[in-house]
């Protein structure tokens, strides 16, 4: 069976990266990469839907990538997660972080960290279709419109 070509596959090839065991990453490492890939997805959709000024694009994107929005999304889609996905989310949510969000409650920030850890896990394990489906479902279930 052929491995699908993904952005991660191309990055690993271009920079001669060896595959790491994703289960060995800390939940905060998963959240770190998850934050970036989630923002890239949202930015891609926002740009694709409207050619606007950078300031307008930033304002639209920010509504979806801030901690309260991510918290609302993960809360709404928790029943949709598999046991494995929920375990990754819980690891991220319960991780001891030394940073806090400027405009979010501690609870929202922790749930957002769990959400980002899940996004990072799905990205690093090549489950891109599942990651995108959860993002779409989370936005819809949280009553947000992209």
Task: List PLM regions with ranges.
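Double-stranded RNA-binding/processing signature
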Residues: 1-146
